[in-house]
Amino acid sequence: MGAFTDKQEALVSSSFEAFKTNIPQYSVVFYTSILEKAPVAKDLFSFLANGVDPTNPKLTGHAEKLFGLVRDSAGQLKASGTVVIDAALGSIHAQKAITDPQFVVVKEALLKTIKEAVGDKWSDELSSAWEVAYDELAAAIKKAF
């Protein structure tokens, strides 16, 4: 991977801010997209036991944390070219036996959600910045398994 640029980091950060303008709505978009592609994912998230409920603080909190981790990964990539995570994050994903296809489903849902959040500001460049940041975060999580 080439160096993560200031522009890429700025694209991720600004679109994260757009996501934060309506976390309940975008959390619904995100988790609904995941469940449409992988209904069994419902069993991986205790807060989805009763479906996608935008008033559930665990649902919105988890979405905000995940999107924030990708944003933080963009910052790390710009600063040092690598993503470092807390080992506990790797442990949680290992315990749940998360597979590569599941990481892909989450990435697709994340991109769909950011696309909705930014509206007409969506671009291939913005998509690519989020993809790189997410892929590097996912690689760091898998490495910590």
UniProtKB/Swiss-Prot annotation:
Q: Which domain of life is it from?
A: Eukaryota
| Tissue spec | Specifically expressed in root nodules, and barely in pods.
- GO CC term, one of those recorded: cytosol
Give the Gene Ontology MF terms in alphabetical order: heme binding; metal ion binding; oxygen binding; oxygen carrier activity
Residue intervals of the Globin domain:
3-145
Localisation: Cytoplasm, Cytosol; Nucleus
Keywords of this entry? Acetylation, Cytoplasm, Heme, Iron, Metal-binding, Nitration, Nitrogen fixation, Nodulation, Nucleus, Oxygen transport, Phosphoprotein, Transport
Phosphoserine is carried by which residues? Answer: 46
The residues that the entry says bind O2 are 62
Kindly list the positions at which Nitrated tyrosine occurs in this protein: 26, 31, 134
List the SUPFAM superfamilies hit by this protein, alphabetically.
Answer: Globin-like
What inducers act on this gene? Negatively regulated by cobalt (Co) in a dose-dependent manner. Suppressed by exposure to excess nitrogen (N); this repression is associated with nodule greening and reduced biological nitrogen fixation (BN) efficiency.
- What InterPro entries does the annotation carry? Globin, Globin-like_sf, Globin/Proto, Leghaemoglobin-like, Leghaemoglobin_Fe_BS
Q: Does the keyword Glycosyltransferase apply?
A: no
Post-translationally, this protein is described as follows, namely:
Nitrated mainly at Tyr-31 and, to a lower extent, at Tyr-26 and Tyr-134, in effective nodules and particularly in hypoxic conditions; this mechanism may play a protective role in the symbiosis by buffering toxic peroxynitrite NO(2)(-). Nitration level decrease during nodule senescence. Phosphorylation at Ser-46 disrupts the molecular environment of its porphyrin ring oxygen binding pocket, thus leading to a reduced oxygen consumption and to the delivery of oxygen O(2) to symbiosomes.
Q: Where does heme b bind?
A: 46, 65, 93, 96
**Residue numbers of N-acetylglycine PTMs:** 2
The processes (GO biological process) annotated in the record are: nodulation; response to cobalt ion; response to nitrogen compound
| Keyword Cytoplasm included in the entry's annotation | yes
Under PANTHER family, the record lists: LEGHEMOGLOBIN-RELATED, NON-SYMBIOTIC HEMOGLOBIN 2
Please describe what this protein does. Answer: Leghemoglobin that reversibly binds oxygen O(2) through a pentacoordinated heme iron. In root nodules, facilitates the diffusion of oxygen to the bacteroids while preventing the bacterial nitrogenase from being inactivated by buffering dioxygen, nitric oxide and carbon monoxide, and promoting the formation of reactive oxygen species (ROS, e.g. H(2)O(2)). This role is essential for symbiotic nitrogen fixation (SNF).
Q: Which family does it belong to?
A: Belongs to the plant globin family.
How does this chain assemble? Monomer.
Q: What is this protein called?
A: Leghemoglobin 1
